[in-house]
Amino acid sequence: MAQTAMSETYDFLFKFLVIGNAGTGKSCLLHQFIEKKFKDDSNHTIGVEFGSKIINVGGKYVKLQIWDTAGQERFRSVTRSYYRGAAGALLVYDITSRETYNALTNWLTDARMLASQNIVIILCGNKKDLDADREVTFLEASRFAQENELMFLETSALTGENVEEAFMQCARKILNKIESGELDPERMGSGIQYGDAALRQLRSPRRTQAPSAQECGC
C-alpha cells in the first residue's frame, strides 16, 4: 500500500491530447509510452481512449493524463469536447502517408481554438521505422513545425524510438512555462493541476512562519 501511495505522489498533473488522422499510430504511441511495448492488435480508436503515467521532469514528478482521440471524421464532434483545458498535445502524422500530413493544419486549428490558449504542441512524424516507404521528408515537416511554432520529432511506436522523448519534451516545455510565470496552474482551463507534493510545499512555508511571528511578539 505504501508503494502505491508513493507512486501516486506528484508535483503537477498535465492534461495531454494525442491527435491526428486515423491510422497514424496514435494508440500505438500511447501504448508504447505507458507499457514500453508495441500494441500488435491496434484497431482504430472509437471515440476516445485514456492512459496516464507519472514521469520525472528535471526533478519534478508530473502525472500525464493522456487522451487518445479518434482520427475519423465521424468522431470529430465527440473528440472535440475533450480538447477543452488540454495543456499539451502530440500532433501525429504518418511519414509514409502524404494524406495524414496534409491534414495537420486542420488538427492544429482545432487544438489551438478549442484547448488551452497556451497549449504546447509537439509534431510527431510516426512510423520512422518505415523509412523506405517515406512520403514526407524530415526537412518538409521540420519547416512546417517551425512555421507553426511547434516542437518536432520523428517517432516509431514499433521500436519505441523518440516516443518517451516526445512526451518528455512537451512536459518539459510546460514545466518551464510554469516556472517562468507564463503559465498559471490555478487559472481555469490551463490543463494543469497541482499534485499533493506541490501543495504540501506551497503550504509548508505558512506553517513554519506562524511560530516565528509569535516568538517575535514575546
UniProtKB/Swiss-Prot annotation:
Keywords attached to this Swiss-Prot or TrEMBL record, sorted alphabetically, are: Cytoplasm, Endosome, GTP-binding, Hydrolase, Lipoprotein, Magnesium, Membrane, Metal-binding, Methylation, Nucleotide-binding, Phosphoprotein, Prenylation, Protein transport, Transport
Which co-factor is required?
Answer: Mg(2+)
One Gene Ontology BP term is: vesicle-mediated transport in synapse
Main location per the UniProt record: membrane
Q: Where is this motif: Switch 1?
A: 44-49
Under the heading NCBIfam families, the entry gives: small_GTP
State the protein's name. Ras-related protein Rab-4A
UniProt organism field: Rattus norvegicus
Which gene specifies this protein's sequence? Rab4a
